[in-house]
Amino acid sequence: MRLNFKSLPELLAFNIKYYRYLNGYSQEKLAELCKLSPRYLTDIERGIHCPPISRLDVLAKALNIEPYELLLNVDRDKKIIQKMKSFRQYNQK
């Protein structure tokens, strides 16, 4: 399933959330691994902040991927995307 993104920060935000979900990390855990504040990571995932390249490298290493993968719009597993949406809705209650 290929998604449409309006901007690079939106694509980056989705990919960070996607790979974070695949790794089973909470925002707090990923922030800790990357030595970021949880609030800053939340803002990245909401597309409010676009991190510098040096941070992309740190995020990618923590997510067990190559940095360029954070910037790719490729087909994603529809089932995983649905699980991510369900998880997000559950956590917002």
Predicted regions and their residues:
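A detector for short, charged/polar N-terminal pre-domain segments
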Residues: 1-11, 81
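Short amphipathic helical patch at the helix-1/turn junction of helix-turn-helix
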Residues: 10, 21-22, 50
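Short basic helix-loop element that most often maps to the first helix and adjoining turn
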Residues: 14-33, 58, 85-93
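Conserved hydrophobic/aromatic packing and binding residues within compact polymer-binding modules
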Residues: 16, 30-31, 41-44, 70
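Recognition helix of helix-turn-helix/homeodomain-like DNA-binding domains
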Residues: 35-49
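DNA major-groove recognition helix of helix-turn-helix/homeodomain DNA-binding modules
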Residues: 54-69
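Short, charged recognition helix plus adjacent turn
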Residues: 71-93
